[in-house]
Amino acid sequence: MCAERLGQFMTLALVLATFDPARGTDATNPPEGPQDRSPQQKGRLSLQNTAEIQHCLVNAGDVGCGVFECFENNSSEIRGLHGICMTFLHNAGKFDAQGKSFIKDALKCKAHALRHRFGCISRKCPAIREMVFQLQRECYLKHDLCAAAQENTRVIVEMIHFKDLLLHEPYVDLVNLLLTCGEEVKEAITHSVQVQCEQNWGSLCSILSFCTSAIQRPPTAPPERQPQVDRTKLSRAHHGEAGHHLPEPSSRETGRGAKGERGSKSHPNAHARGRVGGLGAQGPSGSSEWEDEQSEYSDIRR
């Protein structure tokens, strides 16, 4: 449940980070088509920014974080790559040999991909963002981010700061990948981010935790209902038993039945009427049937 809770925080961070996506974008360039400018995808990298980034990429060295710094000040607000690079380099000494190898290879992979792909895509900000995040995922997975995280969990957790998740989308992408690296890594990151959230947001973070737990709590299973067929069978069986256990006739009904049997030798319907009278309720109708039976019996004797 903690992992899902962290997922909610990541979503909130993305929402906060995209409040003003069009700030600083080139407004002089018209859209290529009517469908190209959706409400949250109006941004386009200005020609000046494009030229500056391309020039920066050419002059940036292969070692260090120079390539990522080229994307820090741009009109598409693609930020965070340089911060991730610097964080990895500053903490490289805390990693084991496998972790150091991952940092070196992953950063080199990302820098190489940025150089080769930037000039081949559209100037639309969403396209540039997608390119950046896609190549970042590819490099992390290619050089086995999870293996490095599992062997250096404590260092990885120390590198993740709550404020960066609110400001930089590349951090969110990195954390989402780390959450898939096994239970130990996931639990450690979740606990760290939750503690930092409470330190920064206080009771608001607790409210979010309560809401997410309430939303994701499995519904209480209703009591098992007996199938309709079974209930029908039981109902029929109940009525059948009630039919077999009829009330015992009273002494008056017994005498009337005996007289009915004697009269049935000449009048076959008399016995049937006697039985119906025995099953019926006591009342005015019962006395009238008794009088009819007496008159019929008198006629038979005559």
Swiss-Prot record:
Record bears the keyword Signal: yes
Glycosylation sites: 73-74
GO biological process, one term: intracellular calcium ion homeostasis
Signal peptide range in chain numbering: 1-24
Coiled coil: none
Modified-residue entries (Phosphoserine), positions: 250-251
GO cellular component, one term: extracellular space
Keywords: Disulfide bond, Glycoprotein, Hormone, Phosphoprotein, Secreted, Signal
GO function term, MF aspect, one: hormone activity
Basic and acidic residues bias (residue ranges): 227-264
Keyword Protein biosynthesis belongs to the record: no
Record-listed Phosphothreonine modification sites: 254
Superkingdom to which the source organism belongs: Eukaryota
Main location class: secreted
Compartments, as annotated in UniProt: Secreted
Self-association and partners: Homodimer; disulfide-linked.
Protein name: Stanniocalcin-2
Organism: Pongo abelii
